[in-house]
Amino acid sequence: MRADTPRLVGRAMTLAYERRTVAEDLTVPVPDGSFTVIIGPNACGKSTLLRALARLLRPAAGAVLLDGADIHRRGTREVARVLGMLPQSSVAPDGITVADLVARGRHPHQGLLRQWSRDDERIVAGAMADTGVADLADRPVDQLSGGQRQRVWIAMALAQQTPLLLLDEPTTYLDIAHQVEVLDLCARLHEEQGRTLVAVLHDLNQAARYATHLVAMRDGAVVAAGEPRRVVTAALVEEVFGLPCRVIDDPETGTPLVVPAARRRVGPAPA
């Protein structure tokens, strides 16, 4: 693998479900050390691309390369030591506690010659501390709020200790406060621990605020990729989403902020 080649690359991929083709000749390199966010309208292929990168969907043509090798020619446990995946809808076994669920992140590192150790205990405790769920360790996961559960799943992915972490719509079904909480956590993992994150998000303004690298998709193709300020323009938003808008600076972060054009003007309230 060349020194300038990212660890994770989707190359010339055709992605399909049975006879329905979602994308053709799709090439997506994931910059090392980035917080990459995939954006686009519904049914454009965002989650399909993420599933392919996560080894959950085999390309009909082309390949996903992990460290220069076809990801489907590598063993499941070997891949799981490098790449973690948080699906869109994760369901915990009934009654399992937070600590026991987070500990499952260590399974790829177990084997006949390597059983549970103090290092595993330390890593699990650290993952729970990093995600702010240590005080919930003995609570059943099914008794937690949506935001708490999502942090627990992220803690399990952290315990897996992979340099690459993929998240499919991690803020789905969460209220705005919990969405910000989860995305702040993802940003901290990227900034403080140097992990490469890839996420699918629906909220364009959240994507522009948190991502260091954006991939904009439409109809199974990449329309633009790069830094948020270069990708999130009024012209591109209208091209990709069909939404006339203005793009201004977010007053809090200076990142691009999409302001939809008014469909109709609302007059002043009657006296």
Q: Predicted segment positions?
A:
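Conserved ABC ATPase signature
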Residues: 115, 140-144
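ABC ATPase nucleotide-binding domains
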Residues: 240-271
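Conserved ABC transporter NBD signature motif
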Residues: 62-70, 79
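The feature captures the beta-strand-to-loop junction immediately N-terminal to the Walker
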Residues: 39-41
